[in-house]
Amino acid sequence: MLFRSGFYGADEYGKICLFPRGGSDTTGALAAFCIDADAYENWTDVDGVFHSDPQLDPKQTPINRLTYDEAQRILDAGAAVLHPDCLYWARKKGTPIIVRNTFRPHLPGTRIGP
């Protein structure tokens, strides 16, 4: 198991720089890519990926499984649960992304991938 802080890195000159919003998501996906991880778990404050904002419609339930393409469409439509760049790195090696809730770790979340 690898734990790594996110949202920062170094530029081509070695200068430390901060990533934009969602940078921690991308950092995690890239780290999973680099170490050939079996999966990348993205822990957040919602129960997984939803078809729409769960705060606007609290009766909906998270989606159990999504393909990369299905997740891409949801993220392109404005879902902010995961940075879209994560899908690029996960798709390159077929690494599943599992979106889970930090405050409700007993829930399975949403599995994205092949």
Protein language model annotation of sequence segments:
Residues 1-114:
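C-terminal catalytic "cap/lid" subdomain
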